[in-house]
Amino acid sequence: DLLIPGELGEGLSTEAAALFGTLTKTEPAALASLDTSLTTQQWQRDVTAIRDRMFRCRTAHAEPLELLTESGSPVAQALVGFVLQATARRTPVLVDGCLATVCGLVAEKIAPGTRAWLYSSQLSPEPAHIQAVQKLELTPLLAFDLTTGQGTGGVLALSALNAAIELVSDEVYAITEAINAQNDDT
């Protein structure tokens, strides 16, 4: 079994950046999108939105459950619960996108050891995503710079994983057959 959470909605990368910033005490400007198509005013609005969300949660940075409550994000709350339940069941989770990865980090703060069950499907250019992957010490399977979330990178990574498993299975079968043939000759 392998679970791939995805998120869908507006403002989720801002929510992820605010959660990450509050949890790690990272400045909002270091978490705002680096998209070169943004104007200075758009980038400033992004920083302001992250800052305002972080301010709302400012007293909760040391307590991850309180941080989730203060954030008011049902999507983040659901994703953290999803990751925690998967970990309790010892089921690997292929996190994809900024919010899912940040929620994996929040889950790690709630239940240390969670990271052992987390795998990163891909790395987006979002600063909060990059930093969350680093904090979790994950190695992304793909580097597509996808910003869509929604599990898209997870599905693509799953295809790559299935192909790798097939290749390894074929190699193991061939080696086993060769060993068996050699044993039959002796």
Each language-model region and where it sits:
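N-terminal loops that bind phosphate or other acidic moieties
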Residues: 1-186
